[in-house]
């Protein structure tokens, strides 16, 4: 009887530890907003004025067409980075790089690897909170080109629809680290196999203000392609040490990474310059692709980012954000992985050497 009670007690302890790990969260949390706030327009002339009249802002704000009719609630839906259960980080290595590595003062992955056209793509997540999936899929697509010399676009839809609860809640938000883990154990098909657009040419949420998470089909839209053969994998998942030198070294050596940050109301108004938070409430967490860095003419160090709100937002779809101060938590948790050669037929470049950055 005593042995049975001991086993029962141990089982209870392990169950409790499991629950604590499952619900112990890490990451970005949004403010609790009132219904009145959620129903108000996200774009405000007052915010534009406050930013543009601030001599120390370092960036310009505007009422851009992308969110001209959107409420705060509709804008918030796009911010799909959820606080991540800490269990997802168990066993995930934190990568650092040789501090003596000499890095350029400015770097842009688009020009470093000009053969990789995917790096410069600006996509549109529509009305779905799928930023966590876009940041991951776009970065891995770029890394396949950098590593293997092949331009491919991987499928956001596969990750969004088929990863399930492990990755979060699909269009209602997810976990960037879990997206990269999905690449390792399940792989992700190409955009050609499982596109993010339906047969009417409407982006998955483009037609509806609250598009539901698509269903996982595990079948290519073209009968000429097999789902299993279209899968592309990563061989590792890791976070990058949270300091500018290591983040720069990772991008310089391996290509773009996925980063997350806290979005405030003023960010919706970004037009140009080096963003830093000036005014407005914390709306939620957003994930994007980090493709480079530099220093502005005013002497402000910045990260160069590719967003997925189409080219009508920001600076032709891109934005710069202050570097070295962990602005809005941007340097907290860069996530990445290395592409696998499984299912890949390497492009013959006439050399056994891997492509490297040209700077």
From Swiss-Prot:
Its EC number is 3.4.22.-. GO terms for cellular component: plant-type vacuole; secretory vesicle. The active site is at 131, 286, 307. Residues 27-102, 343-359 form a propeptide. It is found in: Vacuole. InterPro entries: Papain-like_cys_pep_sf (IPR038765), Pept_cys_AS (IPR000169), Pept_his_AS (IPR025660), Peptidase_C1A (IPR013128), Peptidase_C1A_C (IPR000668), Propeptide_C1A (IPR012599). Glycans are attached at residues 69, 151. It comes from the Eukaryota. The keyword Lipid biosynthesis does not apply. Pfam families: Peptidase_C1 (PF00112), Propeptide_C1 (PF08127). Inhibited by the cathepsin B inhibitors Ac-LVK-CHO, CA-074 and Z-FA-FMK, and the caspase-3 inhibitor Z-DEVD-CHO. Disruption phenotype: Delayed germination and decreased germination rate. PROSITE patterns: THIOL_PROTEASE_CYS, THIOL_PROTEASE_HIS. Disulfide bonds join 116-145, 128-171, 162-216, 163-167, 193-220, 202-207. GO terms for molecular function: cysteine-type endopeptidase activity. Keywords: Disulfide bond, Glycoprotein, Hydrolase, Plant defense, Protease, Signal, Thiol protease, Vacuole. This is Cathepsin B-like protease 3.
């Amino acid at each position: 009887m005593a042995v049975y009670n001991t086993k029962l007690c141990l089982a209870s302890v392990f169950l409790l530890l499991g629950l604590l790990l499952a619900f112990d969260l890490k990451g970005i949390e949004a403010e609790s907003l009132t219904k009145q706030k959620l129903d108000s327009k996200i774009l405000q002339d007052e915010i534009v004025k406050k930013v543009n009249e601030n001599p120390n802002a370092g960036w310009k704000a505007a009422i851009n067409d992308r969110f001209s009719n959107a409420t705060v609630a509709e804008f918030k839906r796009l911010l799909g980075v959820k606080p991540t259960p800490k269990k997802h980080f168990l066993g995930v290595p934190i990568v650092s790089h040789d501090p003596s590595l000499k890095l350029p003062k400015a770097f842009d992955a688009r020009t470093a690897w000009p053969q990789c056209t995917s790096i410069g793509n600006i996509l549109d997540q529509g009305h779905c909170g799928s930023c966590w999936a876009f940041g991951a899929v776009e970065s891995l697509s770029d890394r396949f080109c950098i590593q293997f010399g092949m331009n491919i676009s991987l499928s956001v839809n596969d990750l969004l629809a088929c990863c399930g609860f492990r990755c979060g809640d699909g269009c209602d938000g997810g976990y960037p680290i879990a997206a990269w883990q999905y690449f390792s154990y399940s792989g992700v098909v190409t955009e050609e196999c499982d596109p993010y657009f339906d047969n009417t040419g409407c982006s998955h949420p483009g037609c509806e203000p609250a598009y539901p998470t698509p269903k996982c089909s595990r079948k290519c839209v073209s009968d000429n392609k097999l789902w299993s053969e279209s899968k592309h994998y990563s061989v590792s998942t890791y976070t990058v040490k949270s300091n500018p030198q290591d983040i720069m070294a990772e991008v310089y050596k391996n290509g773009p990474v996925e980063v997350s940050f806290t979005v405030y109301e003023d960010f919706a108004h970004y037009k140009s310059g080096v963003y830093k938070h000036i005014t407005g409430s914390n709306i939620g967490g957003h994930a994007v692709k980090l493709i480079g860095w530099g220093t502005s003419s005013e002497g402000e160090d910045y990260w160069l980012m590719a967003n997925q709100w189409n080219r009508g937002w920001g600076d032709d779809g891109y934005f710069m954000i202050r570097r070295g101060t962990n602005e809005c938590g941007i340097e907290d948790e860069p996530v990445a992985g290395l592409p696998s050669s499984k299912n890949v037929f390497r492009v013959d470049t006439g050399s056994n050497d891997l492509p490297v950055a040209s700077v």
